[in-house]
Amino acid sequence: AGYGDRFTAVHRRFSQVGEAEATGPLHGVLFDLGVSSMQLDEPARGFGYRVDGPLDMRMGDGEVTAADLVNDLPESELADLLYEFGQEHRSRRVAAAIGRARQRARIETTDQLAGVVASALGRRPGGPHPARRTFQALRIAVNRELEELATSLPRAVGLLGPGGRVVVLSYHSLEDGIVKRAFRDDDRLRVLTKKPLQPSDEERARNPRARSAKFRAAERIEEAA
């Protein structure tokens, strides 16, 4: 509200970045790939495993929910999804536990799913919640996050003028790998961060949700005549 007519919010997918209304080449594009704290803490969105809510996880108006994937995917496909998008190395154990649970009753809430995963994997005192990788995988799949990112990066570069910069904040290695390759392989860019910048210990202590953040930047260069 404090920026007046200097700021316009447009609700679109990353892959629709090329449809942005601009009066000329952009000076910079910032991608923040994280789920906002407001989304995580809002039970009705179904992103988090710490508060109960419907197993939804849609960021927009997509048709498929996390509950649809959990209850309708064949067990083997669910295991592959958890391994690929959540990097869950015990994905088959989790998928088998979900398969048994959904035979008894449809899994409709975040609390139900978190409980099933915790029962299958156990919990380490002081360790991260055992369901975090499962929830990550489902959120990525529901919103097609990796496809959106891979599609949108080259489109964003095309909007930049010479000297314009594209900056990306990613939060897990799957995202970071896509960004690293996109920057490296695009001959319109000069990479500014040979290695990603990461939060200091002080920042991690102040904002634990930033602990896995990685910052990469690249600059649009003049194209050859």
Regions found by a protein language model. Give the residues of each.
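S-adenosyl-L-methionine-dependent methyltransferase catalytic core, i.e., the SAM/SAH-binding region
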Residues: 1-225
